[in-house]
Amino acid sequence: MKIQLPEHVKQIIHRLQQEGYDAYAVGGCVRDTLLGRSPQDWDITTSAKPQVVKSLFSHTIDTGIAHGTVTVMLDHTGYEVTTYRIDGEYEDARHPKTVTFTGNLVEDLKRRDFMINAMAYNDTAGLVDAFDGIGDLKRHVIRCVGIPHDRFGEDALRMLRAVRFAAQLGFSIEEKTRQAVADLADNLQKVSAERIQTEMVKLLTSAHPEEMRTVYALGLSRVFLPEFDRMMETPQITKHHCYSVGEHTIHAMQEVQQDRILRLTMLLHDVAKPVCVTTDEKGQNHFKGHPAEGAEMARVILRRLKFDNETIKRVCLLVRYHDDRPAVTPRNVRRAISRIGVENMEALFAVKRADTLAQSMYERQKKLSYIDAYEETYREILKEHQCVQKKDLAINGRDLIAQGMKTGKEMGEVLQALYEQVLDEPQLNNKETLLALALQLQQTKQE
């Protein structure tokens, strides 16, 4: 079986072989190539010790030298080169206390997480597949190398990685591997929020975000996202819905692009429904206030999972306004754009459509027609270059200073008042008119 290796990878392998060492491309890059996917990274495993690797290449970085890893830099691209090793006992469900270097490739492959990731390749030896990884690729199965409880005991994040790979590849998790996840799910508490976040985002932005069902079923979400468990367990007894909050959420995620902000928004858009639910005398559920409450809950969750501030800001804004329904008039839509931000409107329309398509058929066409009208009005406003941001005003502070106004609170109030008027009456947005209005406002304040 022939794999086309990138030139830099061939170069590194060849250089190590020239010095009498074994070297192979290994892990995910081999898996992805066999699946016809483009690897994000190419990792290399070798019998050469780290100091030897460092001596053979002019530009290297000690990325994990204690565990045998040196990054070789070629043309500003990094390639991790790791010495064959046997891992000692793991101390924190993440790192081995000790590693022992070995000259045996198969011993190195034994320590890896899943069979599909335990294959190696070079042009001389071809594919080295000691654990039938190719068979699991053909069967579309995620299966641990060796005893699943041992692999997950070594690194608890592997449990979430199993589900993430299932989501990315469209595979299923083999039964013994699945059972081990269920047995050891609580160990995920030992893993940092940053590592969990990385795996969660990869899962959510995959082709199969519905694997969040597996995250819930195996007990993983109760460790890092217990709010999702409550969503899965909260029914929606209303003609507008046909799924529980959690199932609706999963369907909504499937209705948006594989985009980080959109998938996170759909994951959290109804997060407050379990805490806002009320039931009327007819037995129907209502979720009044859930968008605003959800935005606050989303902020807490995203901070807990160590997301960056910009992601938190955008997701929380979209959660807050996902169910906002202004009357579709140019004035109302201009004010909505001003409130939400022109840069967020495209995402908001995607969120609204996904939310609607994940509901029952009750009034679906009416709801979609409303979104279409909202978006059409928004586009007309942009096409006509109407003022929807303060920076779009035909005047600014410098113009007011030139007219004799002093800087400070009063100027800010005048600019805000002019902006409010222009949102209602866009034809006012010209310099001459606004300067005259500013003068009137200033005189009124002085009276």
How should these model regions be labeled?
Residues 1-447:
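Catalytic cores of the polymerase beta-like nucleotidyltransferase superfamily
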